[in-house]
Amino acid sequence: MVPVVALVGRPNVGKSTLFNRLTRTRDALVADFPGLTRDRKYGRAEIEGREFICIDTGGIDGTEDGVETRMAEQSLLAIEEADVVLFMVDARAGLMPADEAIAKHLRSREKPTFLVANKTDGLDPDQAVVDFYALGLGEIYPIAASHGRGVLSLLEHVLLPWMEDLAPQEEVDEDAEYWAQFEAEENGEEEEEDDFDPQSLPIKLAIVGRPNVGKSTLTNRILGEERVVVYDMPGTTRDSIYIPMERDGREYVLIDTAGVRKRGKITDAVEKFSVIKTLQAIEDANVVMLVIDAREGISDQDLSLLGFILNSGRSLVIVVNKWDGLSQEVKEQVKETLDFRLGFIDFARVHFISALHGSGVGNLFESVREAYDSSTRRVGTSMLTRIMTMAVEDHQPPLVRGRRVKLKYAHAGGYNPPIVVIHGNQVKDLSDSYKRYLMNYFRKSLDVMGSPIRIQFKEGENPYANKRNTLTPTQMRKRKRLMKHIKKSK
């Protein structure tokens, strides 16, 4: 499960600035959910290939009378949902009563907490943080988030070791594996099949969406249609339920974020605070079903969730629920709105269903299987290079400073989502429009449906870079003869 890091502290201590620093590597959108957590942002970040979800919890305000009375209920829940807390204080303002009250609450939760003193630029860090040792949270990590000072150290010496302890990462030398395959192809040898068979694994399917769009009804309808015995397998995140099931001989694991089996135990506050569980379900899934309410249309919250799904690279099936009972005129209007607002997602299948009555539900799994198969299909280097060559023949890359961009070869860089790595010269100068052309060409040629496809470009190294242009003895003799000839002709 993808770990969650929460940034907490008083207002104006620099939480949002640090949040932007942490998430910039993924260009993360940041999913803003108005109405649920108006002052809270969620984003994806990465440390040395390890992803985590970062939460900016907004300011927790309070006085010496007791900060707990001022804490927003959802901020407390954010701390509960997080795996680790970065407690931020303002080194310039010094120790405040609100800091002490927040620290007291964090100590009572026994949650892994790291104390981060921000705004230390221009100060002696050792002197600036002395007072904060009174909070009893151990070592203090001074940073200047606005300038980036100390942030890298915070990542490398605090978050990374903690994440390694949480889930050690298996190291795979992907470059060595690729070059071994490439060399084998050059020598005319067969590509060796690896042991990975995606068809033998269950498809992890997450059903996500806003509250009250019919996620629970759809989950119950799917399980009811199957007539199989299911059991709850609680995940590491509270109230997320993993439900194994089988359909048409294929195994699935339904990831239900609505807590349908523990509904009676969930308070209204926890039910509303489903954002963390939803984001973790997306990260953990192979295919995501985004459920939209046909009567309410596409909301900003739907688009935020959609942005997170796309950034995660997950396969996608869009489900428009509550389709029954709508007039033909309203249905046409809904379809026009979908085309207008979701036109940029041309790879995802859209289904119109009624989870309550079961109409259209049976067709969903065909699209789920198609999306999963597209995202996990293995394609060889020779095939990808051939497709790239055909794309270049159909539409030449643009000229850059009078020289044509040269694409040399392509190979697979990963799966789920499919990643195509293209090597060439001056590829960094390719326009966005040509990159989109290549992406669409690969999608059409490989018949990828239901899954995003990503293309990465790698610049070829110039073997003569930083080398002096020294002539060989033969070249020197030719040059002398040429100069003599030129002088005679004059």
Curated annotation (Swiss-Prot):
Disulfide bond annotation, renumbered to this chain: none
Residues annotated as domain EngA-type G: 3-166, 203-376
UniProt binding sites for GTP 2: 209-216, 256-260, 321-324
Gene3D superfamilies: 3.30.300.20, P-loop containing nucleotide triphosphate hydrolases
UniProt: GTP 1 binding residues: 9-16, 56-60, 118-121
Keywords recorded for this protein, A-Z: GTP-binding, Nucleotide-binding, Repeat, Ribosome biogenesis
Keyword Repeat: yes
InterPro entries documented for this protein: G_ENGA (IPR031166), GTP-bd (IPR006073), GTPase_Der (IPR016484), KH_dom-like (IPR032859), KH_dom-like_a/b (IPR015946), P-loop_NTPase (IPR027417), Small_GTP-bd (IPR005225)
UniProt-recorded Gene Ontology molecular function terms: GTP binding; ribosome binding
Pfam families: KH_dom-like, MMR_HSR1
Presence of the UniProt keyword GTP-binding in the record: yes
GO biological process, one term: ribosome biogenesis
Residue ranges annotated for the KH-like domain, each copy included: 377-461
Family that this chain belongs to: Belongs to the TRAFAC class TrmE-Era-EngA-EngB-Septin-like GTPase superfamily. EngA (Der) GTPase family.
Function: GTPase that plays an essential role in the late steps of ribosome biogenesis.
PANTHER family linked to this entry: GTPASE DER
Subunit structure: Associates with the 50S ribosomal subunit.
Designated name of the protein: GTPase Der
Gene (name only): der
